[in-house]
Amino acid sequence: MRLRFSLRVAAFTAGLWLATPVWADPFFFTTGNPDGQIGALSRRPSPGKLETEAADDFILTETTVVSSATITGLIPLGTPLANITNVEVEIYHVFPQDSADPPSGNVPSRMNSPADVEIDTATRDSGPGTLRFSTSLLNANFAVLNTVVNGINKKPLNTTHGEGPATGEEVEIAITFTTPIVLPAGHYFFRPEVLVTGGDFLYLSAPRPIVSPGTPFVGDLQAWIRNSNLLPDWLRIGTDIIAGDPPTFNMTFSLTGNTVPDAGTPGQANCHGKSISALAGQFGGLPAAASALGFSSIDALQDGFRAFCEP
């Protein structure tokens, strides 16, 4: 009886261990708070308006599931928050990956820019429901010293020095990825776009180099911008457009998620199986992993890592 009791206790203890995460590695990155230096247009395409993209970089040191993000920007004074009707997020590798190389020559440089095209499996859009968002007013009257809106031109007309100051409502958009984004370790650009009925969203700059409460990292690159006339190229907001003795900018955003240190390697035959095994061990089972990472179900988690593992 004593032996049976001991075995039952051991089995029960093992079950508790399996139901508890072996380790928890939350991920959080932020560029900090807006510095009032510049507002750069980041706009979804709409009738009569060019798509315009502003992007800034971040680094992942391990495979990471990104479950949410925030962005901070300026909308026109008096604009209801409900007029923010669509948000899309794309992730880019750093040039020359996913790009034509040598590039077109239509911009001063492509070194350290976002790639020509986005990572297809990492695009999320509130339209089809792969992200949802909420908006809050941070400051009803916020000013920036300069803006970049329309003056996004091929060289030699790239230097406009900006389009002057602006005042508007400072808003934060909190984004939840209903299909979380799974990325291997690497250097990336984060590109949000916002559609505002009756106005535009000016993505607000943050200090560069990053200062508290931001998350500094070695290799921080400056922000880039393009519109549909400039595709597939990008311009540096500071060096190429503002120019002179140019400041360089970060943009105000944050990312939240969890790392998966023992995930498989994309393109390898055992990637999916190794990743799922790592998740089960890390979170104490796949149901707990799906819940903690923000997936709607175990099937959704499996699909997310299947896409991650494709070369």
Predicted regions and their residues:
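PGST-rich, cysteine-poor low-complexity/disordered linker and tail segments that act as flexible spacers
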Residues: 208-260
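Soluble extracellular-acting proteins and domains
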Residues: 260-311
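Bacterial N-terminal signal peptides
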Residues: 9-19
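Boundary/junction segments of secreted and surface-exposed precursor proteins
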Residues: 21-47, 104-106, 258-278
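A short beta-strand-loop element at or near the start of a globular domain
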Residues: 35-77
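Bacterial N-terminal signal peptides that target proteins for export
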Residues: 1-10
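Aromatic- and Gly/Pro-enriched, solvent-exposed loop/edge beta-strand patches characteristic
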Residues: 51, 75, 81-218
